[in-house]
């Protein structure tokens, strides 16, 4: 599996908040964290992480991570790089009988055999709108957040901290 998010440096935040590493945590904590979170959601807790990073604007602005799951490497990449780059995200996950790819805002399923590759209908699907609606329902008390409890978010941040330790050690794997 591989995941990626790319953007120009987030200079549009209030008082340049995103570019202040002490406030935002940089790309590794603000952008890359989403792919680490979904990897944990899909595959569970990694055994170890290895991370390489480049500092361009703040700290850890271009990040490449390998999460190790009992011999299965899951890769993730995140970058605040070129000032001209528009935001994009992508993923590829290989399952037992198909691969699923998300790129250019479209999901495509590639079965091992028949049928031919196809794009599933995802009516009413918009990640941002659904995320905001879910958050609003939790905050208003309409639903209980069992999908992504605070303990899971905290564990993702612990993984990010191990990734920083790995990046600071030139990619040396760190146990989780």
Residue ranges, per PLM feature:
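Conserved glycosyltransferase catalytic-site signature
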Residues: 36, 59-63, 150, 157-160
